[in-house]
Amino acid sequence: MNNKHPENKAKSTTTPKTIALNKRARHEYHLIERHEAGLELQGWEVKAIRAGRANLADGYAYVRDGEIFLIGAQITPLIQASTHVVANDRRTRKLLLHRRQIDTLIGRVQREGFTLVPTAMYWSKNRVKMEIALAKGKQAHDKRHAEKEREWQRDKQRIMRAHNRNA
């Protein structure tokens, strides 16, 4: 029997790709441009992420000494975490990007007043990656306008469905 055909291979049980989403970022910022970055993690953090214990809601990225760091993102340690290693769930983590990407992000943050916001954390080939976005903060009236627009889209869909049922 030939085992080289794809239908003969056992199905791989992969974990879901998305680990965490930052839904607040879409509500509070205008997201302009997205970039993929790696994360410098410790072993206990990877285990905690596999268990689904990551939260990006309060996280943001900042520039220090020509490098970009993630601050405020929470990775809650597992109960079984080692006792001799002090696990700080909100520690500052280095973001891994190419030098050219870092330089362009630094330039846009410093010159144009953008903020770097984490929008998603996901798996890519057994590595944890983070999507960071260049963002501008929304004013209160922008948030209200976006909410009204969403409500109108929902109402429009309801009206169209009701009209199509009656036709």
Curated annotation (Swiss-Prot):
One of its GO terms (molecular function) is RNA binding. Residues 139-167 are annotated as: Disordered. Keywords: Cytoplasm, RNA-binding. Its main location: cytoplasm. One of its GO terms (cellular component) is cytosol. It is found in: Cytoplasm. Pfam families: SmpB. Residues 144-158 have a biased composition (Basic and acidic residues). It comes from the Bacteria. One of its GO terms (biological process) is trans-translation. SUPFAM superfamilies: Small protein B (SmpB). Required for rescue of stalled ribosomes mediated by trans-translation. Binds to transfer-messenger RNA (tmRNA), required for stable association of tmRNA with ribosomes. tmRNA and SmpB together mimic tRNA shape, replacing the anticodon stem-loop with SmpB. tmRNA is encoded by the ssrA gene; the 2 termini fold to resemble tRNA(Ala) and it encodes a 'tag peptide', a short internal open reading frame. During trans-translation Ala-aminoacylated tmRNA acts like a tRNA, entering the A-site of stalled ribosomes, displacing the stalled mRNA. HAMAP family: SmpB (MF_00023). PANTHER family: SSRA-BINDING PROTEIN, TMRNA-BINDING COMPONENT OF TRANS-TRANSLATION TAGGING COMPLEX. Belongs to the SmpB family. This is SsrA-binding protein. It comes from Xylella fastidiosa (strain 9a5c). The lineage of its organism: Bacteria, Pseudomonadati, Pseudomonadota, Gammaproteobacteria, Lysobacterales.
